[in-house]
Amino acid sequence: MDQTNLRRCLATYFGDEKNINHILKKTAGPDQMVQIYQILTTIENPSHSEQDNFRRAVTMVKQNQLGWGHPIFQPEQQKISEENDFITCPYEVSEGVLRCGKCDCTKILWFSKQTRSMDEPTTIFASCSNCKTRWTE
């Protein structure tokens, strides 16, 4: 869809040229059509009132919650962030810090992660490099 048709479509809901330009600026990029479709489907949602839908659509634009920024993708973004952190801070291999309970080896691959509340210590995930036994501490 070209810019003229896109503007015409947005003018149905956002009469002011300033608002249309703002939406086009906020959604600029390769997935612009997907983001505008998301705005329009939010406005046309039959399960809520038109005013509520319009308010939701405006909030999505203002808070950059279009596309991958939408809160529904938050768990997936968290997983990707953890994977990226793993790449920058990989496993540590240490001798003598931990000992395998199965084969008594001291070459252990381990990492720590905060799995409980902040006032609790981090959980250590360990794996023996000799017998591949895994455990947590």
UniProtKB/Swiss-Prot annotation:
Coiled coil: none
Keywords of the record: Metal-binding, Zinc, Zinc-finger
Residues where Zn(2+) binds: 89, 103, 128, 131
InterPro entries: Znf_TFIIS
Zn-finger region bounds: TFIIS-type: 85-136
Pfam families: Zn_ribbon_TFIIS
Superkingdom, natural source: Viruses
GO biological process entries: DNA-templated transcription
Gene Ontology molecular-function annotations: nucleic acid binding; zinc ion binding
Entry similarity comment: Belongs to the IIV-6 349L family.
Full protein name: Putative transcription elongation factor S-II-like protein 055R
Source organism of this protein record: Invertebrate iridescent virus 3
